[in-house]
A protein has these predicted regions:
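Conserved nucleotide-cofactor-binding alpha/beta core module
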Residues: 81-149
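Class I SAM-dependent transferase core
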Residues: 1-93, 109, 124, 136
Length: 149
């Protein structure tokens, strides 16, 4: 991949991987490919899309209402995905769906993901994001993961 020929969004994604992810020692080829293939910007609330590749947590606001939840910084999401050492035969339970981006990354690496989210607004947001990105192996459930699943 040649950085000088990429459109702006792809350049930003490339820079995120090269300047944030790799320096955090996320080097697993499957995780890196997931970061290129799963469109992070499409999981970020529209008002914050310009910050999709920034090295910071992003507040998850739904219709200008703060849910008091955030998307993790990209390097944290990538490191979590790498440390799980997932294979295509794995099934994953994620507690706290948020925007659905981490679930989509995990779904890229595993066979099936069930993600549990307590906030019904975020369940709807995540389901829309996953559907828009044709992620079919992630199921989002409404519930409190602290109570077991």
């Amino acid at each position: 991949m040649n950085a000088s020929t990429l459109p702006d969004v792809e350049q930003a994604r490339f820079n995120m991987v090269e300047q944030q992810i790799r320096p955090w020692e996320v080097l697993d080829a499957n995780v890196l490919q997931a970061l290129f293939d799963v469109r992070r910007e499409q999981f970020v609330p529209p008002a914050l899309r310009a910050l999709a590749f920034s090295d910071l947590e992003l507040p998850l606001e739904i219709n200008a209402v703060n849910t008091r939840q955030t998307m993790l910084a990209p390097k944290v999401e990538a490191r979590l995905a790498q440390e799980l050492q997932l294979s295509k035969s794995d099934c994953v339970l994620e507690i706290g769906t948020g925007s659905g981006y981490q679930a989509a990354l995990l779904g890229y690496l595993a066979q099936q993901v069930t993600s549990v989210e307590i906030d019904s607004r975020l369940v709807t947001f995540a389901q829309q994001n996953l559907q828009m990105n044709n992620v079919t192996n992630v199921k989002v459930e409404t519930g409190d993961g602290r109570n077991g699943w």
